[in-house]
Amino acid sequence: MTLGAATANDPIDSTLASPSRDEQRRQANQAAFSRDLEFLSSLANPYYLNHLALSGALSSPSFKRYLKYLDYFRHPKYVKYLHYPQALHFLDLLQNEEEFRLACRDPAFAGEVMAKQIGHWATWRDPENAAGQEQDEAGEQGEARETTGGQTA
């Protein structure tokens, strides 16, 4: 036998050529985990939620079962891989709040949720700044009520 030539009876070369069952299972599990993590992360995007709502996916029973399956990411063993933890909050809302699923159909709602997320990201490390913004917003709302005669839109 020449060096480097593999034969069907050579156990070393055949194990290198095809992964073992355990290795195949590990690779399949890794691919499924990566797919689930990527999908769960995408739930942090309100515009993607709007797309899912408009496509009808949010009302599909099989999709609702998949959302329930994703609950395993709440376990500390898996949650550490999430870059967007608010995805778990949206997952909870999608699983349990019909009103939220319906609201996701409205692009204006998606924009409002996105604006709130951005506002949170801008201030979450600076609670004093966040409190000041809340006071400013409350003051603006009070001024708006005064100009509309106390009526809200």
Curated annotation (Swiss-Prot):
Component of the Mediator complex, a coactivator involved in the regulated transcription of nearly all RNA polymerase II-dependent genes. Mediator functions as a bridge to convey information from gene-specific regulatory proteins to the basal RNA polymerase II transcription machinery. Mediator is recruited to promoters by direct interactions with regulatory proteins and serves as a scaffold for the assembly of a functional preinitiation complex with RNA polymerase II and the general transcription factors. The gene is SOH1. GO terms for biological process: regulation of transcription by RNA polymerase II. Keywords: Activator, Nucleus, Transcription, Transcription regulation. The keyword Nucleus applies. Component of the Mediator complex. It comes from Mycosarcoma maydis (Corn smut fungus). One of its GO terms (cellular component) is mediator complex. This is Mediator of RNA polymerase II transcription subunit 31. It is found in: Nucleus. Residues 1-28, 125-153 are annotated as: Disordered.
